[in-house]
Curated annotation (Swiss-Prot):
Function recorded in the entry: Displays ATPase and GTPase activities.
Keywords: ATP-binding, GTP-binding, Nucleotide-binding
Chain positions recorded as GTP binding sites: 68-71
Protein name: Nucleotide-binding protein Moth_0258
NCBIfam families: PRK05416.1
Molecular-function GO term, any one: ATP binding
Species: Moorella thermoacetica (strain ATCC 39073 / JCM 9320)
Keyword field contains 4Fe-4S: no
Family as reported in the entry's similarity comment: Belongs to the RapZ-like family.
Annotated ATP binding sites: 14-21
Amino acid sequence: MPETKYPRLVIVTGLSGAGKTQAVRCLEDLGFFCVDNLPPSLIPGLVDLLGHPGKEGEGITKVALVMDIRGGEFFSGLDAALNYLDGLGIPYEILFLEAADEVLVRRYKETRRRHPLSSGGQILEGIIEERRRLEELRGRASKIIDTSELTPRQLKEQVSELFGSSQRRLIVSIISFGYKYGIPLDADLVMDVRFLPNPYYVPALRPFTGHDRCVEEFVMASPVTRQFIEQFAALLRFLIPHYLQEGKSHLVVAIGCTGGQHRSVTLANKLGELLQGENYSVTVKHRDVVRYLSTGNRR
């Protein structure tokens, strides 16, 4: 019989307005499977489902559940669910976020949102009542973060330190594209390589793509190309640690030529090769080259 191996379970809770949404976004970046406001009665079933190999959800090793006062009567069953997990010896961690009353009041006024427990628009009364209701749960917390003086970046750093691996890794996605089809919407950095020699104007090379050796050799034969790709890779090696320090988890680098068929494809591949082996994960995708592989499209 396969050994039961339960996922790492983190329950994120705390005062409304204290930063639970930002904390959960960080946990998602760290690879956690996140569920918002799951009824407590379903927690044991979810943990059991994920803890047995061969069932749905296999491969999920880290789970974060957001539980807060918005759950109403559901939230009152959380204590029973935790006691059930304790009885089975299933480990879990509780991350409790809080902030000073005056800070929470200010945040609610800035966002113009209504506190879930406020009556007649009295924000402070709602905060005090919520703090009272959560007092026992706070006492069970594994980790408590006071966000009163924290910026979103600082909160992300604390959550990453608590629940991330010992060494955070940035995902670098390199995408080739053609300007005639538009710049990728999710690009963080865009590099225009239309200044490089264009294989399109060599009739023998026109039918091929940047994946083909003949096009690659033509593009890389230019001293300007070789100097450019080395300097661009060096720039990224300089930038990436600073992006990581700022809390960024995914960097999209888009490299564009006219049609996304020749130059951008070759250079995206070359850049991926130069960045492999560094302390970050690198993927290379070619958005528009498929247009030229089967349809015979020409610019």
